[in-house]
A protein has these predicted regions:
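Structured, helix-rich domain cores that form ligand/interaction pockets
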Residues: 1-306, 314-369
């Protein structure tokens, strides 16, 4: 299962030279690409930077050079193309910029804590397989992914950004998001529209959808409507392995990954089919043309179940001082007010589940007597 039209789907842009934005030869169907990648690498111990040669001599390798070589292997950005800057970046002591807006930042001491940021044009220098390889390298290095955007370029223009806005304002949208925004550009002194961008989600959210006319933005070089799903924090962390290479060497289609993530974030289904249960509603035809029969793929890891002792610990640390304050104020040995508050409190389903679960089983990690 892939996003877009099966016969015309290009799963990833072909390799590009530095600075190019045009995906040559793609005029119909849908195309999937990685459009932003930010990673933070941190070595936990100095031993991981040790290299012992055949004579037993211990030397240290520079991890910053290591990641430069990894970027070079995937994108063609030569390690010598990074230009050191006279300032740091975002809390890091030192930084360097490379082609297409790529950025490296690190701390001078030990050079074992560093960040790499590859915006859209820099990601466009990777082929699919080289991007997958770089993501696998990042996983092997225990890198933390702070941002990872994946795009669908709809060259058939199945729906316009304004039509997406209209659908998002109507009853057919299925999402947990509460806010959206539309930006419009215009030429001064004329009624000419220079672009419409629709956002679903907040700038600070872990996921945000951006739909816009890439043809207008790129002066016709990429004649498509772009669906850009931005992922940060946990959403980026769980997306990274899906776009790389699994331990057994298998790979998941980028089209399948995009479609599953998109419909878990926002779906468009006919509200007239069922008044309350969105699962019984039929997906709208235009959205089906983009994602087919895609099923939800959760962007967040499942929450660990909470137990009675977790609640006890939380009450002791967070509520204990407030309870002490009230008890000092009430001066009530019979706990009348406290009993009243407890009697009026209503247990929610999550509370009854914790009550049924009881205390932490002794075979779970973190159990203490």
């Amino acid at each position: 299962m892939n996003a877009g039209h099966n016969a015309a789907l290009v799963p990833c842009p072909p390799p590009l030279t530095g600075g190019q934005k045009k995906f040559s030869g793609v005029e119909t169907g849908a195309q999937i690409s990685v459009d932003w990648l930010s990673l933070t690498f941190k070595t936990e111990t100095s031993r991981e930077r040790e290299y012992v040669d055949s004579d037993g001599a211990v030397t240290w390798y520079d991890q910053l050079d290591d990641v430069k070589r990894a970027v070079w292997a995937g994108s063609g950005i030569d390690p010598t193309e990074w230009v050191d800057q006279p300032h740091g970046w975002n809390g890091y002591q030192q930084s360097a910029v490379g082609p297409c807006g790529s950025l490296l930042a690190w701390n001078a001491v030990g050079r074992d804590d560093y960040h790499v940021s590859l915006p859209g044009q820099a990601c466009g220098m990777f082929s699919e397989i080289s991007m997958r390889s770089f993501l696998r390298y990042s996983l092997n290095k225990n890198a933390k992914c702070t941002r990872l955007d994946i795009n669908l370029d709809d060259h058939d223009r199945i729906v316009s950004p304004l039509q997406v806005e209209q659908a998002a304002q109507g009853p057919d949208i299925v999402t947990h998001v509460h806010r959206g925004m539309t930006q419009r550009g215009f030429a001064i002194g004329t009624e000419e529209t220079t672009g419409v961008t629709v956002y679903i989600g907040q700038p600070s959210s872990r996921q945000r959808l951006r739909v816009y006319d890439k043809g207008l933005e790129s002066n016709g070089e990429i004649d498509a409507v772009r669906w850009e799903l931005q992922s940060r924090a946990e959403a980026a962390e769980t997306l990274l392995p899906l776009l790389g290479v699994f331990d057994d060497g298998t790979m998941m289609s980028w089209g399948e990954t995009f479609a599953g993530r998109l419909v878990s974030f926002v779906d468009f289904r006919n509200a007239e089919d069922h008044p309350t249960d969105a699962r019984q509603r039929k997906r709208l035809a235009w959205f089906t043309a983009l994602v087919q029969a895609a099923e939800k793929a959760s962007a967040y890891p499942p929450r660990e179940p909470r137990y009675i002792n977790d609640v006890e610990s939380w009450v002791e640390k967070s509520v204990g001082p407030s309870l002490r304050l009230l008890m000092e104020h009430w001066q009530d040995d019979n706990l009348t007010e406290l009993r009243r508050i407890m009697a009026e409190a209503q247990l929610k389903p999550k509370h009854t589940a914790i009550l049924a679960r009881g205390r932490t089983p002794s075979n779970l990690p973190g159990f203490k007597y």
